Amino acid sequence: MTIPFSSIAVIGAGTMGSGIAGQIANAGHSVLLLDLPAEGDDPNAASSRAIERLLKSDPPSLMDKKRAELIECGNTRDDFDRLAQCDWIIEAVVERLDIKKELYKRLDSVIRPDCVVTSNTSTIPISLLVEDMPGSFRERFAITHYFNPVRYMRLLELVRGEETSPAIMEKLADYNDRFLGKGVVPCGDTPGFLGNRVGVYALQVGLDEAHRQNLTVEEADAIMGRPMGIPKTGVFGLYDLIGIDLMADVVDTLENILPQGDAFFAVGKDGPVAPLIASMIAEGYTGDKGKGGFYRLAGDGSENAINLGDGSTRPRTKTLPALAEAAAMLQASGDAVSYTHLRAHETSL
């Protein structure tokens, strides 16, 4: 079987970068995973910790723990020149345009003429990413936006730039389909593409509505989970899974590139939960990858949840099954779902 790419690297060993590397390893292919050099004796500590997280993840990110042996750790100081051997490099660094642009310029000085470079950006248009790059780079550049968790989320948004070679788009679609098991969806070069243009707005509305309706995070997640077409994590659990800091960057990026007057601004950085999110990030509560987020562990190992009103924590409570059941019934009937409806319906169950 012909493999479109024989030497692959991922730059950025965060949740998404490590997940992408893990799925490449699941396909039986080796991959180089780079991150910033760490202080101390082990400059590869960031990428090494990423592999440890893959091995401990639940549900499992790797089909077999031995697949981790196919992921080679490195850092962008000592191993950057090794990228000259690659024919596909996936950028999965922080969602900031300035950092991505700086990386591309550095890449252009070392990569071989036929190397394909793609970004895992979830929101930034390709026209902005490569606006300062030469034509030879732009024709080999595309966006491959995976979703978290990479092993289980089948969708891949594939975005072509004005100058991207059609042959390269075919190679990317072929590899992701045949080897990574992705459902490849071609997307236009618009802010947020398809998934995040709709999905991030929906999540932000969920945060604001929970605050406005005076819901607990548990109640909100029971209501705005499966009945609303959102994963069983619900809104706040999904925020924790994605990363609260990453979501803040995504919101910031969308506000910087969407036209003034777009409905997104009403639920973005000016939303009622925004100050709480900013303070959580400042204190290191960035979600599952950090000290916790809207849900977090107490010192005794028990689960706590945050109060949206004042940011205090309390023991996590189980929501009444009637809430989720009522939401599902209301959704099936086509009625508008509100907390008042749910409480009334709960009483009748």
Annotate each PLM feature.
Residues 192, 197, 201-222:
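Rossmann-like dinucleotide-binding core of oxidoreductases
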Residues 286, 293, 299-328:
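Intrinsic disorder at enzyme termini
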Residues 113-197, 232, 315-317:
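Rossmann-fold dinucleotide-binding core
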Residues 26, 33, 63-88, 171-181, ...:
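Amphipathic alpha-helical segments at domain termini/boundaries
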Residues 340-347:
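Conserved small/polar residues in nucleotide/adenosyl-binding loops
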Residues 1-53, 110:
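NAD(P)+-binding Rossmann beta1-loop-alpha1 motif at the extreme N-terminus of oxidoreductases
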Residues 37-42, 55-117, 124-126, 291:
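Rossmann-like NAD(P)-binding element
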Residues 222, 226-299, 304:
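Interdomain hinge/lid region at the active-site interface
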